[in-house]
């Protein structure tokens, strides 16, 4: 049997195209994060309890990106926080789990524009049953489901009217899923699976005998979840099919993401907690284990990050979006839709790197 080869962000480099762009100010980074919702900057703050808060979600929303409020709180607290975010920044996105989903949705729907379903594996009966229920329940908010990884998972959930996908399993900086289970796929190839599945699904929705074309407004979004470390990763995520990226680590350790309960003083220094949502700390804090501690299974890590008193959410986001704009000018694309998936359509040329190329790409003059 011949195994398929899979590539990650560090495995490829993009080649420039002819460009008639005279200024990066001409470029539009607006993207869709669900069927009915756009943002101006294709970056989403992950619903992790050590970076996602009312203040961080409001800041992300106000600068044109998006923050997703995490779900690990009482229903009443989540409702009140959703209201604060909605009132301060005009829209709110929040996470829900499968357990108790209906009660949470009913409590928060007045103040919520998009729901993110928090599940490790979107290719399962429970997720499909939930999505069938949600789409017939009368709620109007878009629903992002996942996590997906294969073409099958994306296509099946698209058929059930998902408005978008949290895509990829295992690339997050605090995620141990690939190490613990062997499940995962490098990000560029993983993004291709979602891009191809959505393209196939779009074609299945048109009547070819009437010479119809796919309706771009009916397409579910692809949101790459994890693995984003540098602006180049955002660029390559979009070039390989993503609409936007979901990030946690790049926002960890900032004063405007760390809530007071997640700040620790140690040896005269101030640290912020940062942890994966399947880490031992989270599983124990929220009692997510099954009956006894013997059934506690951990697929994430926890760490302390010295608080960065200089950088802000705005600085981080603008650094990434400026890198994206620069890449768009090299590639000759004026908007995200032109660029998205260009590796697969042939509008972007990519080369496979040698093992040593990563060192050339970093500043190395010191």
What are the language-model segments listed below?
Residues 1-212, 216, 221, 249-254, ...:
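Active-site entrance/lid segments in N-terminal catalytic domains of soluble metabolic enzymes
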Residues 1-25, 182-224, 229-366:
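Alpha/beta catalytic cores of nucleotide-metabolism and tRNA/nucleoside-modifying enzymes
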